[in-house]
UniProtKB/Swiss-Prot annotation:
This is Translation initiation factor IF-2. Belongs to the TRAFAC class translation factor GTPase superfamily. Classic translation factor GTPase family. IF-2 subfamily. It comes from the Bacteria. Pfam families: EF-G_D2 (PF22042), GTP_EFTU (PF00009), IF-2 (PF11987), IF2_N (PF04760). Residues 309-316 are annotated as: G1.
Amino acid sequence: MGKKRIYELAKEMNKASKDVVDKAHQLGMDVKNHMGAISSEQETKLRQAFGGGSTVNTQSKATNNQKQQTTQNKPANKKPMNNKPGEQRNNQNRPNNQSTNGQQRNNNNQNRHGQSNTQNRSNQTNTNNQNRNTQNNNGSTTNQNRTSQNNNGGNNQNRGGQNRNNNFGGGQNRNNRNNFNNQNRNRFNKKGKKGKHQQESAKPAVPARKFRELPDVLEYTEGMNVADIAKKIHREPAEIIKKLFMMGVMVNQNQALDKDTIELLAVDYGMEPQEKVQVDIADIDKFFEPEAVVEENLTTRPPVVTIMGHVDHGKTTLLDTLRHSRVTSGEAGGITQHIGAYQLDIDGKPITFLDTPGHAAFTSMRARGASITDITILVVAADDGVMPQTIEAINHAKAAKVPIIVAVNKIDKPGANPDHVKQELSEHELIPEEWGGDTIFVNISAKFNQNIDELLENILLIAEVEDLKADPTQKAIGTVIEARLDKGKGPVATLLVQQGTLHVGDPIVVGNTYGRVRVMTNDMGRRDKEAGPATPVEITGLNDVPQAGDRFVVFEDEKTARQAGEERAKRALLEQRSASSRVTLDNLFESLKEGELKEVNIIVKADVQGSAEAVSASLQKIDVEGVRVKIVHAAVGAINESDVTLAAASNAIIIGFNVRPTPQAKQQAEQEEVDIRLHRIIYKALEEIETAMKGLLDPEFEEKITGQMTVRELYKVSKVGTIAGCYVTEGFIRRDSGVRVIRDGIVIYEGKLASLKRFKDDVKEVKLGFECGAMIENFNDLRVDDAIEGFIMEEIKQ
């Protein structure tokens, strides 16, 4: 027999489903609710618990007989329905060979249609009496099946008008209702023609949602909504909304909650509220803090050495000698155009070298090289001595607090004087060790490989003293040495790893760009899969070209790296837009004040050299007190992108004489907000500049009387002051104008109006012939017939 549900058993025993469920729990049965299914043994226990055990035995017996008859007589289910009426009457005296299921269906049809059949009333009476005695779940027993043969026959004979069992008790037989429910439950086993129209079996009950315990701590961020909190504490949003409603807070599941509400809700649930600190993923500088390094994982790393000095003093030649390669031959004109990063192995000890340009235009690149280095080699030519870029390199190294090794180069040349170099450098606090100082001096010849080993020994000695260490196990961080856009590879960046190990495939944020390391190439042009601390590598895979000097950080996943890179690019764009606007002839007065000294930066471009010189000389002759003209650049030719870049960097105005800007320069000028003025006549250009420069002078003001009014009445109001009822006798009085109180021709007070009203309404201006009420700031000693004079200060144009 199939399992029975709790609500069916409760209906049979005239008990509430809840009582049966509770009794089942007491007996240790795993029942969730009234839809739970129980076995026949569990049903027996429940009936015995409610005092009805004998009925269960009869039911079980009937159930067994029913199963046997169903198995033996399955083909007989269809045969009686096809018999002729005469055969059906003969079948009434035949022993009952029909299955219980077939009889149940026929009896069900009789009960459902409710038509009378007087031929079988006596048999129905016997059946009903027997049903009341047995009251089993199927509504019939084996004896009942024997005595109800005539019912079957009568039913088959009268299929057009089916008969109804009469219940002498005054209502429909309860057993027949149970029989109807049981038939519906077992009909899915029925095969044959009528099985198509039978009802589907009841689906199993959906298991109840598993109860999950509340967490001990609610980690929240301010602004979380109800739906987010519901997921964290494993509760329905409706439950949280109801609880908040009981606390007096009306919200929906998508409404953001403040910090206090979230904490009160957590306390009400018995959890400890803990605010989660929001981490700014776009802030990559925090990865470079010393606290982020784990001391236990530190290992010795190679030193980073920067070669600095004046142009053409032999820096690249020295590195060329160290690398045994011809780096100089590949440079334009033999002058280093960008920072080169190389790693050399000296007796099993690697050293990373950075070669910086010595030209005057590369100041920022030298400063960047000094900021990421451990040791600075200052190359000075013995025949040339200390030069401007030499002094600049010294200042960069001192600012970065980096030890300096002085390499006196070109000692092989005639006229070389290393002692003179030492004398000059001692004036800049670089005193040789033999003179009692702490600076190492090495006399070398990079061209002929003289004393190079001594220089390398001193580098390794200082590196050992400095005890340089790094953590190779963490995510890689470092600095961009240089970057470019390659036609075949796309954005290419040369990186110097400072901490951690960089791998191929790592998600990376470089400055305001992001991407994944696709190809990693070392300084020898070979592909590597990883790069440790103090190792320079060239990578591809970025979405844009970063700026030299930008920092890079490796992230856990590409999604986070993309978010950080996009956020950094967005912030950089907003910062650029919010920066102060460029100088134009229209805003010179507001934007070019430098204390007492003011100057206008101008770039002059002309069609011929003579015109450029003439315009420059004429502009410099403009004599306006306190303002001077500075010619940043003067040249011949069209206004190009370089001119716009220079103007943006120097905050200058471009004057074009008989020339036009190129389309690229015009577009860049719009982006950089650089002011370009084009002229064909010299004196008009001079006049325009002179007019703008006059606007830079401190303005002079003169007083202008706007009107006068007479005091006719006084109203003294406590805690407010004296209100004067006035009549305008001349001109007009403005709310923002200055006023003088004149009594008997003598000015007794000068100040500003506190309020000006007409008919209790604040007004900006009262004209001639109108009355008004006025109050003067910090002055209440007004009298009737006092004159109040209004005035404003106007700027005098120069």
